[in-house]
């Protein structure tokens, strides 16, 4: 049996997505590992999708959370990059094969054997990974990030998913090569508001695209967008046809792509980042007649993620957050489902994750040699 350390978090046990106190085990810190005491963890929209099994591949119990900032409390003997007491981060992935074409190009996020921070098997198949809604995590040092000085631990946490999710496609699809290009950001939520900030830091002229005008003043006056386009205003949409070089589509709900394609210039590029539950219709005619492109992007590799953190620290880019207690997570998930957050929930794990000593132990199961105990 693998050596284990006791750990505690909040887990979903079924498709209701309700999170409850949960005792489980982490592996012992190995020679290549870093043990992290978790201070803060962001709440990503994919956490909501996963705990409710919207994508059909959830395996319960699940402790979500892949926007983790904490303190290194142990380092393995082969680890030279980190030392005890360092402020570190853990993002969406915690393992890959390290030998495929993608890994050799620092694109571990596209490795066929990528290991996700939660709802996945460990690299050796002996245990199930659990995420950052918990007190501690043990991670291979190659998938641990250094949090730069000046980057806050709480509002910096969402950058480990939301930040790299918008930063990587901006680099790959050529949005950073020439300042003054026009970028449309469809949707002003957890991803969208970071896309505005990073886009402006890259010298782009940013237009927020939204269904309503409620966030217009905030987008322009506080987030720094250059303009705001309401998709229900037919006259403004007509005036904006062919004005944008790029569009980053952050919307996860079902929506039409044709109005967005019409906004692109010839050779324009639309990059989809949201993950709707159902496939979207792709209007081929608009692409062909305008030599336009549609692409996608999934987070980034470790090297690029570290680069993104340094970039955000330099430009003082953080997420706009609402700090919550662990006990507030279920109401936060309900609000997230209604897009009732500006713009990211972050759990104050260190100050609010408290075991309930009086709670009754209801279930205990053994999963590939790893004992998991659920408490409610």
Curated annotation (Swiss-Prot):
Binding site for NADP(+): 46, 165, 187-192, 210-215, 250, 274, 297-299
Tissue: Expressed at the base of the stems.
GO molecular function, one term: cinnamyl-alcohol dehydrogenase activity
UniProt xrefs under Pfam families: ADH_N (PF08240), ADH_zinc_N (PF00107)
Record-listed E.C. numbers: 1.1.1.195
Gene3D superfamilies in alphabetical order: Medium-chain alcohol dehydrogenases, catalytic domain (3.90.180.10), NAD(P)-binding Rossmann-like Domain (3.40.50.720)
SMART domains xrefs: PKS_ER
Keywords: Lignin biosynthesis, Metal-binding, NADP, Oxidoreductase, Zinc
Entry binding sites for Zn(2+) 2: 97, 100, 103, 111
Cofactor note as given: Binds 2 Zn(2+) ions per subunit.
UniProt pathway: Aromatic compound metabolism; phenylpropanoid biosynthesis
GO biological process, one term: lignin biosynthetic process
The protein's required cofactors: Zn(2+)
Catalytic reaction equation(s): (E)-cinnamyl alcohol + NADP(+) = (E)-cinnamaldehyde + NADPH + H(+); (E)-coniferol + NADP(+) = (E)-coniferaldehyde + NADPH + H(+); (E)-sinapyl alcohol + NADP(+) = (E)-sinapaldehyde + NADPH + H(+); (E)-4-coumaroyl alcohol + NADP(+) = (E)-4-coumaraldehyde + NADPH + H(+)
Domain of life: Eukaryota
Enzyme class, spelled out: oxidoreductase
Subunit structure and binding partners: Homodimer.
Summary of the function given for this chain in its UniProt record: Involved in lignin biosynthesis. Catalyzes the final step specific for the production of lignin monomers. Catalyzes the NADPH-dependent reduction of coniferaldehyde, 5-hydroxyconiferaldehyde, sinapaldehyde, 4-coumaraldehyde and caffeyl aldehyde to their respective alcohols.
PANTHER family given in the database record: ALDEHYDE REDUCTASE (PTHR42683)
The protein, known as: Cinnamyl alcohol dehydrogenase 2
Organism name: Arabidopsis thaliana
Gene designation per UniProt: CAD2
């Amino acid at each position: 049996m693998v050596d284990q350390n006791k750990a505690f978090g909040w887990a979903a046990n079924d498709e209701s997505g309700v999170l409850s106190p949960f005792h489980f085990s982490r592996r012992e810190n190995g020679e290549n590992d870093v043990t992290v005491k978790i201070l803060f963890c962001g709440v990503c929209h994919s956490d909501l999708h996963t705990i409710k099994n919207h994508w059909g591949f959830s395996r319960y119990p699940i402790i979500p959370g892949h926007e983790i900032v904490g303190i290194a409390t142990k380092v393995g003997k082969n680890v030279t990059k980190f030392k005890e007491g360092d402020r570190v981060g853990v993002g969406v992935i915690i393992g890959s094969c390290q030998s495929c074409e993608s890994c050799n190009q620092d694109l571990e996020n596209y490795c066929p054997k990528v290991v996700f921070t939660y709802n996945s098997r460990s690299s050796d198949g002996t245990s199930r990974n659990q995420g950052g809604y918990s007190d501690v995590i043990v991670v291979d040092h190659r998938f641990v990030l250094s949090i730069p000085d000046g980057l806050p631990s709480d509002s910096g946490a969402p950058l480990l998913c939301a930040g790299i999710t918008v930063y990587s496609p901006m680099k790959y699809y050529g949005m950073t090569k020439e300042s003054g290009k026009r970028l449309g950001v469809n949707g002003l939520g957890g991803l969208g508001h970071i896309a505005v900030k990073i886009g402006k830091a890259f010298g782009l002229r940013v237009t927020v695209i939204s269904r309503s005008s409620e966030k217009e003043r905030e987008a322009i006056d506080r987030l720094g967008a250059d303009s705001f386009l309401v998709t229900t205003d037919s006259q403004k949409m007509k005036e904006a046809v062919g004005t944008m070089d790029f569009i980053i589509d952050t919307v996860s709900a079902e929506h039409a792509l044709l109005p967005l394609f019409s906004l692109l210039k010839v050779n324009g590029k639309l990059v989809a980042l949201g993950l709707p539950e159902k496939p979207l219709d792709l209007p081929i005619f608009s692409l062909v007649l305008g030599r336009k492109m549609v692409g996608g992007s999934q987070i980034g590799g470790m090297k690029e993620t570290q680069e993104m953190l340094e970039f955000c620290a330099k430009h003082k880019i953080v997420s706009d957050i609402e700090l919550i207690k662990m006990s507030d997570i279920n109401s936060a998930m309900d609000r997230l489902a209604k897009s009732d957050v500006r713009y990211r929930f972050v759990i104050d794990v260190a100050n609010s994750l408290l075991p309930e000593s009086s709670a009754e132990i209801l279930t205990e199961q053994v999963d590939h040699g790893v004992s998991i105990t659920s408490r409610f």
